[in-house]
Amino acid sequence: MEVILLTKVENLGNLGDKVRVRDGYARNYLVPQGKAKYATAENIAEFEARRAELEKAAAEALAVAEARRAKLEALEPVTIASKSGGEGKLFGSVGTHDIAEAVTAAGVEVEKREVRMPLGPIRQTGEYDIELHLHTDVNATVKVVVVAEQ
């Protein structure tokens, strides 16, 4: 099935690209999320009429994400206190939700879905570099320090 992308989609294409995707991906994800429209003649004409508006909105979203990245990278290391046993092993773990809350408390709004932890949750005390995915083109790194709770 062919669709026209209304936003940049990671690993697929940019705004305005006409791409071929599987039917289920288009029907269940891209179209309901507002990321694409079916590539009919009518939709193509409508898209071309709105192209400048969509490009402006995409540029504004990118500028906002860049500003957030600058704030995040200027941030001091974020400290999270968690209960731990001997040798720095945590009782439980520190996950995306905990990190998002701590960074938000430090002064920059971050959602749980923006936190990337490819190695899974943190289970040891120590210093970690956590990547935040703010936009398809913008990533920021925040230093998180996990300490034992007193």
Curated annotation (Swiss-Prot):
Keywords: Ribonucleoprotein, Ribosomal protein, RNA-binding, rRNA-binding. Disulfide bonds: none annotated. GO terms for biological process: translation. Transmembrane segments: none annotated. Gene3D superfamilies: Ribosomal protein L9, C-terminal domain, Ribosomal protein L9, N-terminal domain. GO terms for molecular function: rRNA binding; structural constituent of ribosome. GO terms for cellular component: ribonucleoprotein complex; ribosome. SUPFAM superfamilies: L9 N-domain-like (SSF55658), Ribosomal protein L9 C-domain (SSF55653). InterPro entries: Ribosomal_bL9, Ribosomal_bL9/RNase_H1_N, Ribosomal_bL9_bac/chp, Ribosomal_bL9_C, Ribosomal_bL9_C_sf, Ribosomal_bL9_N, Ribosomal_bL9_N_sf. It holds the Pfam family Ribosomal_L9_C. The keyword Zinc does not apply. PROSITE patterns: RIBOSOMAL_L9 (PS00651). Binds to the 23S rRNA. Belongs to the bacterial ribosomal protein bL9 family. NCBIfam families: L9 (TIGR00158). This is Large ribosomal subunit protein bL9. It comes from Thioalkalivibrio sulfidiphilus (strain HL-EbGR7). The lineage of its organism: Bacteria, Pseudomonadati, Pseudomonadota, Gammaproteobacteria, Chromatiales.
